[in-house]
């Protein structure tokens, strides 16, 4: 799917998805970003009871740096990775990227995906 589709679906569920920065032009990197966005929308609704998801995409050191947060309830402790997040981590790591989850001061999904040379 595309980021537009994620935004439309989220909107129907009452969640606004704000994207700052540009999606990676590389298909695989873009798909991973979209998958992460989708997962975060689901988690925002299911666990955090939030209605806004923020996605920040930046380019740094030949990598796409993606940070996803929401305005929902702050987690009370470390996030347990459910099947959605571990599947996402698996996809990102098999592409050579990294995924970190922080829960302080609020939930954040931090993803680094290597950029292909022709994208830079």
Where are the model-predicted features located?
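Short beta-to-alpha transition helix within the HATPase_c
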Residues: 1-15
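Conserved short strand/loop->alpha-helix "switch" segment adjacent to the catalytic nucleotide/phosphoryl-transfer site
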Residues: 15-38, 79
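Conserved transmitter core of two-component histidine kinases
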Residues: 14-22, 65-67, 99-102
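Short beta-strand/loop element within the Bergerat-fold HATPase_c
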Residues: 52-62, 69
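ATP phosphate-binding glycine-rich loop and adjacent ATP-lid/helix-beta elements
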Residues: 77-105
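Conserved ATP-binding N-box helix of the HATPase_c
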Residues: 30-53
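A short beta-strand-to-loop micro-motif at the C-terminal edge of the catalytic HATPase_c
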Residues: 58, 100-108, 114
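Glycine-rich nucleotide-binding loop
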Residues: 63, 73-74, 104-110
């Amino acid at each position: 799917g595309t980021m537009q589709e994620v935004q439309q679906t989220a909107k129907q569920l009452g969640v606004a998805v704000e994207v700052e920065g540009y999606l990676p032009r590389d298909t695989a990197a873009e798909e991973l970003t979209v998958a992460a966005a989708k997962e975060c929308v689901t988690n925002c609704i299911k666990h955090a009871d939030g209605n806004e998801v923020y996605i920040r995409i930046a380019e740094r050191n030949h990598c796409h740096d993606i940070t996803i947060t929401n305005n929902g309830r702050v987690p009370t402790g470390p996030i347990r990775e459910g099947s959605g997040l571990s599947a996402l981590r698996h996809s990102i790591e098999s592409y050579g990227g990294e995924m970190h989850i922080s829960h302080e001061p609020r939930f954040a999904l931090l993803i680094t995906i290597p950029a292909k040379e022709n994208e830079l």
